[in-house]
């Protein structure tokens, strides 16, 4: 049995890390949250990730140890091939993905892919970016502009303006609905 790869996307500040952290706290026997390999210090940012040097990253990529990889915001990101084992064992796997690299995920996982785009209103997004304090005003404006102009096609939209609990419940409902549909195919 093949699980689904849930490719969670959204602009920086949309709440992806908070959503993933909350999901990790809930008991989900068939849903695994994948960690990412990133060329960023382990203490930088709020994301639970595995920090790699660029050399380590390129070594893993060169040895085909990354199922998916991409470059964004001056960093390299990757998801290990272990997710393929999890999917083939029947687990659903949730990945903090990239909007720009959705086509790469579609090409590899095809019908097993469930793309979900996390969205928030511009006002809330600005507030979140300002509160976390990682970007200056011009960087925040650039992120807001990119968020406004780039929403992937053919993906499920999940609004994250409300409570974190509500967003997690909605995401789990979507995943379970797709499980039923997937089982009927």
UniProtKB/Swiss-Prot annotation:
GO terms for cellular component: cytosol. Keywords: ATP-binding, Nucleotide-binding, Transferase. The keyword ATP-binding applies. Signal peptide: none annotated. It catalyses: alpha-D-ribose 1,5-bisphosphate + ATP = 5-phospho-alpha-D-ribose 1-diphosphate + ADP. Pathway: Metabolic intermediate biosynthesis; 5-phospho-alpha-D-ribose 1-diphosphate biosynthesis; 5-phospho-alpha-D-ribose 1-diphosphate from D-ribose 5-phosphate (route II): step 3/3. GO terms for molecular function: ATP binding; ribose 1,5-bisphosphate phosphokinase activity. ATP binds at residues 10-17. Pfam families: AAA_18. Gene3D superfamilies: P-loop containing nucleotide triphosphate hydrolases. Catalyzes the phosphorylation of ribose 1,5-bisphosphate to 5-phospho-D-ribosyl alpha-1-diphosphate (PRPP). Accepts ATP but not GTP as a phosphoryl donor, and uses ribose 1,5-bisphosphate but not ribose, ribose 1-phosphate, or ribose 5-phosphate as a phosphoryl acceptor. This is Ribose 1,5-bisphosphate phosphokinase PhnN. SUPFAM superfamilies: P-loop containing nucleoside triphosphate hydrolases. GO terms for biological process: 5-phosphoribose 1-diphosphate biosynthetic process; NAD biosynthetic process; organic phosphonate metabolic process. The keyword tRNA processing does not apply. It comes from Escherichia coli (strain K12). Its EC number is 2.7.4.23. The lineage of its organism: Bacteria, Pseudomonadati, Pseudomonadota, Gammaproteobacteria, Enterobacterales. Belongs to the ribose 1,5-bisphosphokinase family. It is an enzyme of class 2 (transferase).
